[in-house]
Amino acid sequence: MPSLVAVIDDDHAVRESSESLIRSAGFAVRVFDSAEQFLKSPYLRKAACLVLDVRMPGMSGPELRRKLLSEGYEVPVIFITAAADEEAKARELTNGAVAYLTKPFDEKELLPAIDRALKSGSRRDHREDRR
């Protein structure tokens, strides 16, 4: 079964194009229009990687990541944003994000970031299995 990638973005066009791109690369993908929708979904703890919009109405991508971490759910995260903010980028990468991409991004940016995220998640899972 392919790894599940969850895309959480309030922009319909970004969700649609990301879903198509990720699916064409052979991954399972689910899209959500808000952090709150993702939190209520049956896919909450099934995603192997999250692609999160930084700025969304309601809970932002970084807020969602912090909430998940506070609940013990560590999942690799790729942030996407329309606003280039080097300070926010540095902060999120320092805090463990796999990538921080500025829209519009393309497959040469997103797909390698997803591969890195899934590999980092796989290494973490193996470490937890040995405990």
Predicted regions and their residues:
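The C-terminal output helix
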Residues: 115-131
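Receiver (REC) domain active-site loop signature in two-component systems and cognate sites
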Residues: 56
